[in-house]
Amino acid sequence: MKALSARFASAATVLTLAALTALTAVLALTVRDGDRLGDDPVGLFWWYAASWALFAAAVAAVRRFPGRRVVWLVVAGGVAVAVTGLLGPPRTSTDSYRYAWDGRVQAAGISPYDHTPRDPALTRLRDPWLFPTGAVCRTPGLAPIARAGAASPCTRINRPGVHTVYPPVAEAYFLAVDRLSPVGARHKPLQIGAALISLGVTGALLLVLRRRDDDLRKAAYWAWCPAVPLEAVNNAHIDVLGVLFAVAGLGAVASRGPARRAVGGVLIGAAVATKLMPAVVLPGALSGVRRFRDAAAVLLPAAALVVLSYLPYVFLSRGSVFGYLGGYVEEEGYDASSAGSRYALLRLLLPDSWALPVLVLAVAGVTLYVMRSGDPRRPWSGALLVTGWSFVLLTPGYSWYALLLVALVALDGRWEWLGVALAGAAVYVLGPAFGFQQALTNLAYGSAAVLVLVMAGIRRRPAPAGKWGDPVPRLASAEPAAEERQPEELSGTVRDSEVGS
């Protein structure tokens, strides 16, 4: 029997390493191949699909990997995967150019909320990298900048005629990167910073899982996910910083004691003040809370951090510190049920005018369910439920939004929610090839929703021990099964199958 177990462990090691090696190679080729989003989005998506398939193979193989070495494998694999994002400039997003510009503007002592990149008052801050001239301005994706008395330049910054939309913690990060970057470093410091933060998320996941005596293999759902090198590292999306704060905050909230819950509230507040979207984890942070003071221990520090982070910019700015936020919401169609592909699945089933009210009611219902019945020791389970269904119903068109969802999957282990992240990638990459038709959004997010519902049904069915268990097998040191716990430990909790449905 021992010889057979050793043989299985050896085979699992070989399969895991082979899948990781292939995944790293495909991601490297995807990044090095160049910007094909406008030229060949279908071809680019095949590279994405290959990387996701290899990712699935790797996390499936690691289930049988010897537990004593799993931390080193998760970390080493995460480093290899993250490094692939550094092999080229941003390929499918220009957001990081705005980050670099906002950092430069702040370094000059100017509020990033006061001027647009097109404003002539900031001409002295322009350089040939962000504001090139000549033939390069005919490249798709570059926007013209009018300037009297000189050759008309263009800019790599998207929406150069509007004010920045990023919250204050994000802006502070942009300033820090600008201050620490050598002259002429261009996009690379933002990518390196994002890579380090993504590895920090892996470390935070491992710490939270270890504290819970949970299976450390779950961290591979984040560390090896293709969305991390492609969106967090290569495109350097600021969302990854919000993910780090959110994971650390939920880990602190899961600890007993008001002081740690307050620290968790501060960290979640920092996540919200980085990208706003992590506010969806707040219901999870309040899972099973019955007393007002317990809720206040999280909410008040979170709100205080958000308010305090805005204050310096309020005093420094002459205009609104919310920048283009309202315009962005309108542009993306979140304020109009009939615009674009937002609320696609709801609009498939209901009249357009019903979509927004139904979404609000549905998300409110999920939120109340989590707050009333969630397990306070596993706040990420409720956070995953609220975040996942919010994504399914909102059907966002940007793939990097799902970075938060991927991290919550790594904490909770319900891998089926990764289908929502893949759906976002499909909609974003294939959109140009299909004219951004709503049918693509319906197919992608509809398939993801079906997968979630099917797996929820499977998890609710009684099964013989060992046939259906956690998505990732527990280690020998894992948390004891429910029947082995003391009765008082089980009161007020939600079954895993309920939280993950």
Question: Regions from the language model: what does each represent?
Answer:
Residues 2-326, 355-501:
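Multi-pass membrane glycosyltransferase architecture that uses lipid-linked
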Residues 330-355:
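Membrane-lumen/periplasm interface segments of multi-pass, membrane-embedded glycan/lipid transferases
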